[in-house]
Amino acid sequence: MPKSIMLVSLGAVVGAVARYLLSEATERMFGHHLSEGGFPYGTLLVNVVGCLVIGILGGWGVPDLSNSTTRLLLITGLLGALTTFSTFGWESLELMQNGKVGVALVSIGLNVVVGLVAVYGGYLVGQYFVSEVVS
């Protein structure tokens, strides 16, 4: 098996399990599931966590996000399996089809805005770690 497939697979296993555990914990905490008319908190959480992590990695310069090994393991594998654009899209459509257009728009807005804020915040945290280690 090529090294690239092994790296993506390893990262994806960790990311998928983390996604499942975070989504389940979120559902238990809030007691709502989308099928019961609830807000898709689990999807929002995993997407924001993924954005935060990629921001931290980018700000920290771990080791170089354009490095193929790092990118395959952490970005394509781990964060690719952790975050979920397709589920986000499906849940948004499902909310709209069920007449919850306002809830869908809030979910869309939160995923996009909070996700971008998390990437930037993570980047600043990563930069802070770099400045502390170098100093």
Predicted regions and their residues:
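Membrane-interface helix-loop junctions in multi-pass transporters/channels
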Residues: 1-135
